[in-house]
A protein has these predicted regions:
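Short, well-ordered alpha-helical segments
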Residues: 27-29
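P-loop NTPase catalytic cores that bind/hydrolyze ATP
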Residues: 24
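Hydrophobic alpha-helical bundles in membrane proteins
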Residues: 74-315
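Short, charge-enriched, intrinsically disordered boundary segments that mark the beginning
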Residues: 1-12
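Cytosolic juxtamembrane regions of integral membrane proteins
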Residues: 31, 35-107
Length: 315
């Protein structure tokens, strides 16, 4: 007869671990857990400790988003999450470059002379955008832990900032910060200790292009104000870039992992563009329609590509 402690531990395993892993390791894990838990009161009233629960949840993340030694669909899901994280790094690099240039505390005064006006909000915004850039660079240069810490701190700061808003601004704030939260979650879930660092050379080039493109357009917007073209291209750079990448992926009949990663990002970026469309920003309605069509097509292609038998592979 099972003790209450064993039942509670098995319940923890059911919640935290995928079925394929439990089928292979559950009995072994239960035996090891109960080996030194022999006290009758403990068996009747005891619970798995916080340390055990935390370790089990961490194992669950590593096995649900595995890089090897798991069913094919599980490995593919892990690859999708890691791709979402890397695309998110490019997105945050572009947003960071835009933010650093657009949030510089300057105003035009006395003709072309720039006069600095520093305030706490501007300082926090500037530091946050610099941290976003540093986190993106850290990730593509192999400093995964640094990147995860920086993006985690940014997510917390932005969450506090949204919590201070009221009314419709809360919803808009949530939509604006969704990309950084998605990036952080994907980094933490996908790049766990068992996941190898992928080849980063092409991602370094991609980040350089992302930062330089966003920076050039934003600088043009600042210097050429009030010309609308610069503002429009700067605002739409990230979703247009992801959209073009998605179209190219479909045209080349790329794999399901790439399709799901790009499709997911089109879904994440779509709500903010819908807000722009509500304010009748030029070209945004057409962009929203294209993002919706291409995003759905990518997700359908990706999900179809993952429909294959899942075979457990024990290392």
């Amino acid at each position: 007869m099972r003790s209450n402690l064993e039942n509670r531990y098995r319940a923890l395993l059911r919640v935290a671990l995928p079925g394929w892993y439990r089928a292979e390791r559950e009995e072994e894990m239960v035996g090891l857990f109960l080996a030194d838990r022999t006290d009758e009161l403990d068996l009747e009233h005891g619970w798995p400790g916080w340390g055990e629960a935390g370790a089990t949840v961490a194992l669950g993340v590593r096995t649900r988003f595995a890089a090897s030694g798991a069913p094919a669909r599980t490995v593919a899901l892990g690859d999708v999450v890691r791709l979402v994280a890397l695309i998110g790094v490019l997105v945050q690099g572009a947003y960071g470059a835009q933010g650093v240039l657009s949030m510089l505390p300057v105003t035009l005064a006395e003709g072309d002379r720039l006069v600095a006006e520093v305030d706490p909000f501007t300082v926090v915004a500037l530091v946050s955008n610099v941290a976003m850039l540093v986190g993106a660079v850290a990730m593509v240069t192999g400093f995964r832990t640094t990147a995860k810490v920086l993006f985690g701190l940014l997510s917390a700061v932005f969450l506090v900032g949204v919590g201070r808003d009221a009314g419709p601004e809360v919803v808009l704030g949530l939509l604006w910060q969704l990309p950084v939260w998605v990036t952080t979650a994907a980094l933490l879930a996908g790049f766990h200790r068992d996941a190898p660092t992928p080849e980063l050379k092409r991602w370094r080039w991609a980040l350089a292009g992302s930062v330089l493109g966003a920076g050039a357009l934003t600088a043009g917007n600042v210097l050429a104000y009030p010309y609308v073209l610069f503002a429009l291209t700067s605002m739409l750079l990230v979703p247009v870039a992801v959209l073009v990448a998605g179209v190219v992926h479909l045209a080349r009949r790329g794999g399901p992992v790439g399709a799901l990663g790009l499709g997911w990002w089109l879904v994440v970026l779509l709500p903010v563009e819908l807000v722009y469309a509500a304010y009748s920003v030029p070209l945004v309605a057409e962009l929203v329609a294209a993002m919706a069509v291409v995003g759905v097509a990518l997700l359908v292609v990706g999900l179809r590509g993952l429909r294959r038998p899942a075979t457990a592979i024990t290392p």
